[in-house]
Structures are given as structure tokens and as C-alpha cells.
Amino acid sequence: MKVIKKLNLLNELTMLVCIFFFVCTISLIGIGIMYDLINRTSLSAPRRDPIFRNLNTVLIVLGVLEILLMVAQLVMSNMAANIINEVAENVEQKFAKALKWSRFLPFGLLQLYCYHKIKLVTQTDNI
């Protein structure tokens, strides 16, 4: 049961990181569009204008944050895959191959499927 609690916590953290990643992506796209529109409309405006520096800084910070969130999601997905592999040593081959590649999928969608399948297997074992 400790493993299920670990996986539960890990999946909740992964979903939280995914939500932040999604918000960061939308913000990055929105600010990028604003930056481009301002850049196109003010062709004669000097580049030293504070709005350009502020938007440029925000774009850089959001880009770095997005990369960090991607790395965090990959690490947590890898941890979840390792925990699932420890629990399910006698899993059928097709499922094990899917689990191996799921750690590279965005948002760990296959990871969540694998987690729920393992949860069902452990629940039926407890009955």
C-alpha cells in the first residue's frame, strides 16, 4: 500500500507540474504575440524602449521556466515508471514495453493509464 501512496503523490505532483507547464505555454504564446504585434506596429520606435526590454525579459524567464518544468515532469515520470516496475515484476511484455516508452510522452498520459492498471491489479490481489 505504501507504493500506491507514493504513486498517488507522484501523479498528483506530475499533474500539478503539467498544469503549470500549460499555463506557462499559454502565457509564452500570448506574450510572444504581443511582442510581435508591438514590434511590427512600431517599426520606427527605438529598441531601447522599456516595453521591449520588459517583454523580452518576461519571454526569457517564461522560456526557462518552461524548460525546467519539462525536466521536472520527465524526472517525476521516470520515478513513477521505476516504482511501477518494482511493483509489477510479472507484468505482460506488451505492458512493460508501453511503460518503458511512456516516460517520454507529454504529460505522462500513458503513465497514468499504467498506474491505474497497477492499482486495479493490487486491489484485486487484496480481495
UniProtKB/Swiss-Prot annotation:
A cellular-component GO term for this protein: plasma membrane
This protein's record includes keyword Membrane: yes
Membrane disposition: Multi-pass membrane protein
TM region(s), chain numbering: 13-35, 57-75
Keywords: Cell membrane, Membrane, Transmembrane, Transmembrane helix
Major localisation: membrane
UniProt subcellular location: Cell membrane
NCBIfam families assigned: MPN070 (NF045737)
Record protein name field: Uncharacterized protein MG055.2 homolog
Native organism: Mycoplasma pneumoniae (strain ATCC 29342 / M129 / Subtype 1) (Mycoplasmoides pneumoniae)
